[in-house]
């Protein structure tokens, strides 16, 4: 740890009985691939799962001998077990039979309990060594039963669902299907380059705004989005109404015949226009006149109300501006009072100040993420009158040279109320302590003592609110040591600063501390 003047930075087969056949029909089938792995047998499955599956439903070559056939499910024995009466069953089948049909053997009705069953490992090894055919259609491979599962995992004839249309296809065909045959494969429009599923392309082509279409009237080829404008304005053969349709002419003609129609029907169009004008100039009856007067009165009333509301709005706006200025003045007064209260509180410290740093876990996380963490304490006085000081805590980054993962702790002088009445530069002793917050009778605080060096700028009278130059320890305490005891409690770190403007070496020795040698100021 170094003390530095810091500037800003720092069995046998038997025929099945009627009872056995009935049990076979009642045993539930499971449509799930049987686990037959090469080195990992079905014995690795959980007991609850094993009780729900039957024998191996595969084709054996040569055909399965009857001695390896379960009398209940009539398939090859899976997890073969033997009864005291010498019969073999699938483990799951016989357990289900005992629980559903009673404690008896399905073949000879002898009394049979679950704890009387014992594994037939010989039969199990024999069955797993039998040759079987791959169940996938088209695959001609044969292998031992124990290798069937591994083969099926890589068999090119195994079925798998297309990720786009969800239909099943054999593995060797799935890529061709996805690229060329799948109705949900992605294609793009030749006209607008939009992407869509192949099965949706036909509908898109019928509505694509950039597709070429032929005008049904003049056979002009245009893109679809231009066609409505073409019909309304440009198509020479599109049917349109007469210009005088609003006045009573109901004729329709091609656009290129409109001029001839207007020329040939000028007189009739004029008569229609005259009748329309005449109907508009007819004097309305008294009922309409009274209604118009009522509307005028209503408008006049609304205008008066609008003027009054406008005046009210202006008055309210002026009041609001006055209130806003008053609130701003109150806020300034509150800030001034808060500053005065803080100043008074700082003066009550009498040189001993305990700084509570909350949310310290957040600061440690920022340090681990290599984000700079620099925290300043509120100001405090060494007495009344006295010097005004503050502390600065800096969590050094993991990449910092010579001080990585250390807590740096410094003291800064501040402009205070009594600066003009105090001797400068500051002289005295500063004791910095990180408090142990454990409940132990004897607490092990981490404490360092330093003497002020009057020749350093850090102890000169500050010319700005806070002296940018500080004095303290770059390597005050390692973060690993911080975690070894209860220095952090309720996510809060307590830092104590005791300042004495008189240096009493005798009192320091009596308390068991020796002043540390200080490094040259930087």
Curated annotation (Swiss-Prot):
Maturation and modification: Sumoylated on Lys-124, Lys-142 and Lys-453 with SUMO1.
Alphabetized CDD domains for the sequence: MATH_TRAF6 (cd03776), mRING-HC-C3HC3D_TRAF6 (cd16643)
Recorded consequence of changing residue 118 to A: Loss of TRAF6 homodimerization and impaired polyubiquitin synthesis
Keyword Oxidoreductase: no
Cross-link Glycyl lysine isopeptide (Lys-Gly) (interchain with G-Cter in ubiquitin), sequence positions: 124, 319
Catalytic reactions on record: S-ubiquitinyl-[E2 ubiquitin-conjugating enzyme]-L-cysteine + [acceptor protein]-L-lysine = [E2 ubiquitin-conjugating enzyme]-L-cysteine + N(6)-ubiquitinyl-[acceptor protein]-L-lysine
E.C. no: 2.3.2.27
Keyword match Metal-binding: yes
UniProt subcellular location: Cytoplasm; Cytoplasm, Cell cortex; Nucleus; Lipid droplet
SMART domains the UniProt entry points to: MATH, RING
Effect listed in the UniProt record for changing residue 453 to R: Loss of SUMO1-modification and c-myb-mediated transcriptional repressive activation
Zn finger limits (RING-type): 70-109
GO BP, one annotated term: positive regulation of leukocyte adhesion to vascular endothelial cell
Function according to Swiss-Prot or TrEMBL: E3 ubiquitin ligase that, together with UBE2N and UBE2V1, mediates the synthesis of 'Lys-63'-linked-polyubiquitin chains conjugated to proteins, such as ECSIT, IKBKG, IRAK1, AKT1 and AKT2. Also mediates ubiquitination of free/unanchored polyubiquitin chain that leads to MAP3K7 activation. Leads to the activation of NF-kappa-B and JUN. Seems to also play a role in dendritic cells (DCs) maturation and/or activation. Represses c-Myb-mediated transactivation, in B-lymphocytes.
Stored PANTHER family: TNF RECEPTOR ASSOCIATED FACTOR, TNF RECEPTOR-ASSOCIATED FACTOR 6
Family as reported in the entry's similarity comment: Belongs to the TNF receptor-associated factor family. A subfamily.
Domain notes for this protein: The coiled coil domain mediates homo- and hetero-oligomerization.
Subunit architecture: Homotrimer. Homooligomer. N-terminal region is dimeric while C-terminal region is trimeric; maybe providing a mode of oligomerization. Upon IL1B treatment, forms a complex with PELI1, IRAK1, IRAK4 and MYD88; this complex recruits MAP3K7/TAK1, TAB1 and TAB2 to mediate NF-kappa-B activation. Direct binding of SMAD6 to PELI1 prevents the complex formation and hence negatively regulates IL1R-TLR signaling and eventually NF-kappa-B-mediated gene expression. Binds to TNFRSF5/CD40 and TNFRSF11A/RANK.
Name of the molecule in the record: TNF receptor-associated factor 6
Annotated organism of origin: Homo sapiens (Human)
């Amino acid at each position: 740890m170094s003390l530095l003047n810091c500037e800003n930075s720092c069995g046998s087969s038997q025929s099945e009985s009627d009872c056995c056949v009935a049990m076979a029909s009642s045993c539930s089938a499971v449509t799930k691939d049987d686990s037959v792995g090469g080195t990992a047998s079905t014995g690795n499955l959980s007991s609850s799962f094993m009780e729900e599956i039957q024998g191996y439903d595969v084709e054996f070559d040569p055909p399965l001998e009857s001695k390896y056939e379960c009398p209940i499910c009539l398939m090859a024995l899976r997890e073969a077990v033997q009864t005291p009466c010498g019969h073999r069953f699938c483990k799951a089948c016989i357990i289900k039979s005992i629980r559903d049909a009673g404690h008896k053997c399905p073949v000879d009705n002898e009394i049979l309990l679950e704890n009387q069953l014992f594994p037939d490992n010989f039969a199990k090894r024999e069955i797993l060594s039998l040759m079987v055919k791959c169940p996938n259609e088209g695959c001609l491979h044969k292998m031992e039963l124990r290798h069937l599962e591994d083969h099926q995992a890589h068999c090119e004839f195994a079925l798998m669902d297309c990720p786009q249309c969800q239909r099943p296809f054999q593995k060797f065909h799935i890529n061709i299907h996805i690229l060329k045959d799948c109705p949900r494969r992605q294609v793009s429009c030749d006209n607008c380059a939009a992407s869509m599923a192949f099965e949706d392309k036909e509908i898109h082509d019928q509505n694509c705004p950039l597709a070429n279409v032929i005008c049904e009237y003049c056979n002009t080829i245009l893109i679809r989005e231009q066609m409505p404008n073409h019909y309304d304005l440009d198509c020479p053969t599109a049917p349109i109404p007469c210009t005088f349709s609003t006045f009573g002419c109901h004729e329709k003609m091609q656009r290129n015949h409109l001029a001839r129609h207007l020329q040939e029907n000028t007189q009739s169009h004029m008569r229609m226009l005259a009748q329309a004008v005449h109907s508009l100039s007819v004097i309305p009856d008294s009922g309409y006149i009274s209604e118009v007067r009522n509307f005028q009165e209503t408008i006049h009333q609304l205008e008066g109300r609008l003027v009054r509301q406008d005046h009210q709005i202006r008055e309210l706006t002026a009041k609001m501006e006055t209130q806003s200025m008053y609130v701003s003045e109150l806020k300034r007064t509150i800030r001034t009072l808060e500053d005065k209260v803080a100043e008074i509180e700082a003066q009550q410290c009498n040189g001993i100040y305990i700084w509570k740093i909350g949310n310290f876990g957040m600061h440690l996380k920022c340090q681990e993420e290599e984000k700079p963490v620099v925290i300043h304490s509120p100001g405090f006085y060494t007495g009344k009158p006295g010097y005004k000081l503050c502390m600065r805590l800096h969590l050094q980054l993991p990449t910092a040279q010579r001080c990585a993962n250390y807590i740096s702790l410094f003291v800064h002088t501040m402009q205070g109320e009594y600066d003009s009445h105090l001797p400068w530069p500051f002289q005295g002793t500063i004791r910095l302590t990180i408090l142990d917050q454990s409940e132990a009778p004897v607490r092990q605080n981490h404490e360092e003592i330093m003497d002020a060096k009057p020749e350093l700028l850090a102890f000169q009278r500050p010319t700005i609110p806070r002296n940018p130059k500080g004095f303290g320890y770059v390597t005050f305490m390692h973060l690993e040591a911080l975690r070894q005891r209860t220095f952090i409690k309720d996510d809060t770190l307590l830092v104590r600063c005791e300042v004495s403007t008189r240096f009493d070496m005798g009192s320091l020795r009596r308390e068991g501390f020796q002043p540390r040698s200080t490094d040259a100021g930087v």
